[in-house]
Amino acid sequence: MSIIFHENTKEFHLTNGQVSYIMEIMENGQIGQLYYGKALRDRDSFQHLHEEKMRSLMAVALPEPSSLSMEFIRQEYPSYGTGDYRMPAVTIQQKNGSRICNFMYQSHEIFAGKKSLAPLPSTYVETEEEAETLEILLHDEVIDTDLVLSYTIYRDYPVITRNVRFFHKGKEAIVLDRALSASVEFNDMEFEMVHLAGAWSRERYVKRRTLEMGIQAIQSLHGASSSEHNPFLALKRPDATEQQGEVYGFSLVYSGNFLAQVEVNTHQMTRMTMGIHPEMFSWELHAGESFQTPEVVMVYSDQGLNKMSQTYHRLYRKRLVRGEWRDKVRPILLNNWEATYFDFDEEKICLLYTSDAADEENLV
């Protein structure tokens, strides 16, 4: 397990032998994504993965001869107003009404272990050797605001976790209108989107749809993640099955309003964004105040949906669940509702409790 920074090419490589995630500091100072998938052997440069080409009517970020367009480049945390017309990960409203922001690389830190996001729930480590973390500090000089992109790669799992933290320094207050937890991009659209939908008493039906140009999304505006959609989606290759093929899983560790969205542009590039739903979200930051997004847990599998599922099960049982009962057999709870509904009295309740078939330790 290691996080490697190549000074000459300004590239970051997160790898643990099971998965690789590679980023770069682009020539305009923003963070670009180069690769996410099966583990690659480290090398001095991954610039062959940087794809840039001229396209009709595109907005170019730098003077000629540059052909860098934010609309057609893979970005780590896209913002509004930089020439990218896809849905952004962040939108910040200033006092004058402007929603344009442009966060540029300032510095980075690599350290062993993983920070807590308390009071937000998040995955954790018990020893620093279990994981390594990269924090990339970005800054927008116009609104005088810092943004920290945080990535943790686990030693024993094909897992990378992500979250974002904002810290406002400017004199005038700003308003976060959109502050998602993660954005991941792919150079093609050859995926099926898998999610879990349903309703009360029939939750979690597996739904699959082939990606099309435009936006496909799941969400909740219930104030909770709800029984209708789990805050999870997977992108699988069309030939992936339970046991073979590539699958990318994305799970938001948050139980409130959420949005999980996949957008395909006109050149068949795919962008997955996930986080707190922007609808009805508006968070004001004054000087010295900060905002922490929830965590997204990303799982890569080259052995189909089953390995992705097993990875989430193992990780969440051991590194999300916590406390006394994590590794203990829990007491049996008998709830009379399914047995009696509203048709109950003292005699029926006592009969349930004393039944030989009931080996319960608690009764509700």
Which sequence ranges carry the predicted segments?
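Single conserved hydrophobic/aromatic residue that forms the stacking wall/gate
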Residues: Y353, A357-V364
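An acidic-aromatic substrate-binding cleft motif
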Residues: L315-L352
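Polysaccharide-binding surfaces and accessory modules of carbohydrate-active proteins
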Residues: F5, K10-H13, Y21, I31-E263, ...
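Terminal connector regions
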Residues: L305-R319
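Short acidic, Pro/Gly- and aromatic-enriched capping/linker segments at domain boundaries
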Residues: M1-F12, T270-L285
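Conserved, mostly hydrophobic/aromatic
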Residues: Q18, V164, G288, L334
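Short, basic/aromatic beta-hairpin or loop at an interaction surface
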Residues: V262-M272
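Short Pro-Gly-centered flexible turn/kink motifs
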Residues: F103, W283-D302
